[in-house]
Amino acid sequence: MRRTLLAFLLLMLIIPAGAHPWKPRHYVIIDSDGSIDDLKAICMLLASPDVRVLAITASDGYHKAPVAYEKIRTLVDGLWHQGLPVAGGEDAARLIEETLSAETTPVTFIAMGPLKTLSEAMDQSPKFNEKVKQVLWTNSGLPGKTGLNYRTAPDAAGKVLAGSVPVIVTGAGGDGFYNQNMLEEIGNIHTPYAARVKDLINSMPSHSFVYTAFDEMAPLLLHFPELFTAAETDNKGIYNSPADLNGLRQATLKILRGETVERMQVFKSMPADTSFYMPDLQPFVAQIRNRYGEDEWTSGVIGNELHRHLGVYAIIGVKMGIRAREYFCTGVDEMMVTTHAGSMPPLSCMNDGIQVSTGATPGHGLLTVSTEKPFFAAADFTYKGKTMRISLKKELADKVSSELREINFIHGLDSDIYWELVRQNSIKYWLQFDRHEIFEIAAVE
């Protein structure tokens, strides 16, 4: 009977991870004092498709809240997440309440500094005890009275530890975490999050703490609790010490690669071997993947297969959808989309790319094609009550449109030469069009 029960519980753990790969297991609010290990940890949380960062608050700690806010806002904007809510000071508790009120999934509150903001949120946010399932705090031990995060706000720490929400603590034990081999491995990961972590470390090469993992233990514990040793304390909390540093190093690389969920539904991954791709595309495969990331590459391949030919507007739609997900810091199947590309090719081919890159399909009830004229290369993306319009810059839209008209005029749609030239153009723009440069983004009231 006991074996049967254990098997059932294990099955329950496995099924959610495999049945809904587009829905992350961890919805989090982060509170940070803006220190360098906080910023590295935030990069890790943003890199993981198994985490949805709902909001970040800035608090007094290593830095004062206004300085922490600027560091965090600069970080997330530099990672193209301009739509991710960040607040500090008196606005922090308000943002926490707004975020919890809008979220239906239980939330983990990750505190990577003193607990003053968290303590205030417990008082000021009616939804806190209802929506927050656990607090994950980084501190040197538990109660950890010698730790900076405890000493900065001891009364707040005592209040949180005595509260009704479970508190899990980690932090110490990561000295010398970023060794030379680790830095080389991070340098070989082609994601903006890995690049930013390496930049942060290289910004202070003479400071030993920059090579230490402290707040980074929070995302590691969230994803890989089996690599820690847990011990209950007298404070009703659990302290988690790193048990396998080499394993945690490999786990960090896995997070920075975005390998925390199975993204595909039929095959495991897109082939890395360029011989799997058509000869005319082979010379550009590595460049496109490394420059724009695995999400854009995978969506581009699937989108063009769905489309049944390589088309520049389908590729523009892929890039537009990925850019929208970046902006809101969200995943697939989480946005409502209204496209303004109409239903007439070639412009309407953009709709296919948007569907693949966002998961906003008619079958999911998330995609609407506007019938309002004139049609143009743009779409409205709505997430958590906020709508942003992303439009292809006019000069680029005019250029793409005129090129296609010219090819059509000279060769005609029934000509093999027409489709070959369209294919060549599509590969060219797939490589040349940087989604961070080709679009205009504006709020829709």
Predicted regions and their residues:
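N-terminal acidic, glycine/proline-rich low-complexity segments
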Residues: 20-276, 362, 443-444
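Surface-exposed patches in mature extracellular/periplasmic domains of secreted proteins
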Residues: 83-84, 312-314
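Non-transmembrane, aqueous-exposed alpha-helical and coiled segments at domain scale
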Residues: 260-310, 316-445
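Short, motif-level signal for alpha-helix interfacial/capping segments enriched in acidic residues
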Residues: 13-18, 289-292
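A short N-terminal beta->alpha junction/helix N-cap motif
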Residues: 33, 59-63, 287, 307-312
